[in-house]
């Protein structure tokens, strides 16, 4: 074997290693995305002003195994009956007592601030309307209470959607990634 043949074999070997590495990295990224993250299209205005129609979010599916859900999380729920998925804000956990009075949220008789609604509540209040009607509800074991941030225009646990179980929850919002110029974490 001459030096030229050895050099060609080394180049082919390096090329093969590079191609295989690219394929393995792509497969790893695809697997991570498939198992841990899912893109989701926002349809409608039920989460306005926090999330807008046609925005795209990345949903963290791993949260189900890494620490669970917390009040205030933005979650994606899959409705088995309709086959559709919805984005809502997690308000109540299993066993919670939820009360809304004069547009103020109380959980287990403790006043809860909703900073994500502060400006929106003020706008609505100036027009002489309350954002959320008064109600009281107990969250059953194994269920969650959810509402859209656009309380005047949201199908949620108050009015027909019911209370999802943990199995119905796909994951939590981790990033608004589209439109690209408005990337952010919505909270």
Curated annotation (Swiss-Prot):
Taxonomically, the superkingdom here is Bacteria
Q: Which GO terms describe its cellular component?
A: plasma membrane
Write out the catalysed reaction. Cleavage of hydrophobic, N-terminal signal or leader sequences from secreted and periplasmic proteins
Q: Active-site residues? A: 46, 88
Intervals, Extracellular compartment = 38-187
Record-linked PROSITE patterns: SPASE_I_1, SPASE_I_2, SPASE_I_3
* Keyword Transport in record: no
Please give the start and end residues of each transmembrane region.
17-37
Q: Which Pfam families match?
A: Peptidase_S26
Q: Which residues form the signal peptide?
A: none
Single annotated GO MF: serine-type endopeptidase activity
Q: Which UniProt keywords apply?
A: Cell membrane, Hydrolase, Membrane, Protease, Transmembrane, Transmembrane helix
Question: So which stretches are on the Cytoplasmic side?
Answer: 1-16
Q: Which family does it belong to?
A: Belongs to the peptidase S26 family.
Q: Return the protein name.
A: Signal peptidase I U
Gene name in the database record: sipU
């Amino acid at each position: 074997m001459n030096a030229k043949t050895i050099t060609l074999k080394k180049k082919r070997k390096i090329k093969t290693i590079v191609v295989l590495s690219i394929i393995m990295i792509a497969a790893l990224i695809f697997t991570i995305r498939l198992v841990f993250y899912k893109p989701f299209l926002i349809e409608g205005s039920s989460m306005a002003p926090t999330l807008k129609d046609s925005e795209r979010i990345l949903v963290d599916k791993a949260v189900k195994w890494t620490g669970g859900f917390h009040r205030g999380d933005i979650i994606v729920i899959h409705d088995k009956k309709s086959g559709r998925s919805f984005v809502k804000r997690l308000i109540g956990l299993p066993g919670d007592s939820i009360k809304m009075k004069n547009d103020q949220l109380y959980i287990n008789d403790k006043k809860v601030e909703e900073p994500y609604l502060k400006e929106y509540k003020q706008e609505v209040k100036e027009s002489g309307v309350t954002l959320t009607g008064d109600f009281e509800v107990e969250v059953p074991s194994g269920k969650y209470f959810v509402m859209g941030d656009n309380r005047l225009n949201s199908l949620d646990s108050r009015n027909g959607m019911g209370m999802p179980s943990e199995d119905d929850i796909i994951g939590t919002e981790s990033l608004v990634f589209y439109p690209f110029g408005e990337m952010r974490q919505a909270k």
